[in-house]
Amino acid sequence: MTQTASERFLTASPANLVAGDFRPLAGGDGDTIQSVDPASPDDVVFESPTRRGDVADAVAAARSALPAWSGRSLEERVAVLRRWQELTKANADRIADLIVLEMGKVRGECLFEANALGGKVDITLGPESLSRVTDYTVPVNDSRDGDCRFKPHGVMAVIGPFNFPAHLPNGHWVPALLTGNTIVFKPSDKTPATGQLLAELMQQALDESGAPKGVFNMVQGAADVASTLTADPGIDGILFTGSWSVGRRILEANLDHPGRIVALELGGSNPAVVMPDAHLRQAVIECARAAFATTGQRCTCTRRIIVHEAIADTFIPAFCRTASNLLVGPGDSTDPVFMGPLVTEASAREALEFQSGLVGAGGSVLVQATSLDRPGHFVTPGVVQVDRFTVENDTECFGPIAQIAIVKDLDEAIEQSNATRYGLAASLFSAERATFDRYFAEVRSGCINWNTGTAGASSKLPFGGLGHSGNHRPAGAFSVDYCAYPVASMVERGGAAAPPAGMLVEDGWFDA
């Protein structure tokens, strides 16, 4: 890491956090990781070897801290999260600036992400979420009650993504800590400095509360460290956000651990359908926002736009003009930039190769995605019209390339929406509730929106997908479900029970 970046954002040099102490990464035995400014790739933000050996120590520290942490009262754990909330609010600009520098998206979005960290605490402590892990008692019969109480899973591995390097892992560890789990966090190797800043703030919150050392740990690294972490026998659960290919490998590696929860929030090939009675201006704005927000680097971005033939000649040119006029530039620009650079040079190359592949398969370029003639991983929006979508050719492109297909009716729109292995988000634009209700009933997706884009989500609601998009709802309001498990107890309250028929028990056997 450059000295400038270190001085501006981090307290410690590049390090892992193990049992409350930051261990310098210098001289480590793991793969070297590096992050650069995507708008100015010659500027290195973070560069260091990693330490695979720290993974076992971090898991052991989390295991050691678990009894004391889970044994604390709910109020004590809430107090730590409230302090975390205060620290993230006080450091929101610092967090946002570092995300811009390391990930590249526009600063307004980065600041929104930084402010959402504290909001997740409020949501998790709200009745819609907290009620899902609140103990309760029910009468079972005349003499017995049934208790339901919740226990933490134990040591949870949280593996974060690069596109929302603060918000998404925070969405896992806030409910996990609340319910008494301990954490080993591995940030994306594309945003390690952001991960370390969050770890520094979390450790400060824990230290100020007198929490046990090892409640929250962090290990930096790439695939080698992630594989070591997810294979560690001391892990009780894995909360992962990332691609289908990596999520599949994690799931396969845990087939012999049926008791270990593996919650995967993966990618999407998300459709948006525009019907003839839609408000077309609204549909254009929402589809463009959802397709190109974060330079196409959201799992909920609209990848496939399905347009009814009756309005195709109006919608498609308007959408293409909107895409062509989106302002692309550095995330910290004072201009009203909509899209920043892609996170890596490889990401930029893959987006352009994806566009070429669509053309090679018969697609027609309506808006040509190109690299900007300037330093940085900048790619302009692309729009490609295809004849139809098929499961066989369905691929998630994590970049600013939108595909458009024309359909003749709602039946075909539903069929085309379902022509995917994914099932994360979908949108329908129509004035009729009945049209949306049918679309909702027949489309396979975890999030189905009406007259708003696929990229809109709220932590107050469940979030997750089907198929290649994931296996649980580890984000949003239902995230607590995957951080604690219910335990049932039958409680006799009526004293000595009468023996059942066929069993003889004499009172005299128990005389002193």
Region annotations inferred by a language model:
Residues 1-101, 281, 359, 404:
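Short, structured beta/alpha segment
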Residues 39-46, 210, 235, 273, ...:
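Conserved C-terminal structural/oligomerization subdomain of aldehyde/semialdehyde dehydrogenase
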Residues 41-42, 77, 99, 180, ...:
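Residue-level signal for inorganic ion chemistry
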Residues 45-50, 64-71, 158, 272-275, ...:
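Short, well-ordered beta-strand elements within core beta-sheets of diverse protein domains
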Residues 56-60, 68, 82-93, 105-133, ...:
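Long amphipathic alpha-helix in the N-terminal Rossmann-like dinucleotide-binding domain
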Residues 135-282, 336, 407:
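Rossmann-like NAD(P) dinucleotide-binding subdomain of oxidoreductase/dehydrogenase enzymes
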Residues 182-184, 365, 447:
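A short hydrophobic/small-residue beta-strand
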Residues 204, 245-388, 450, 498-499, ...:
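ALDH superfamily catalytic-core signature
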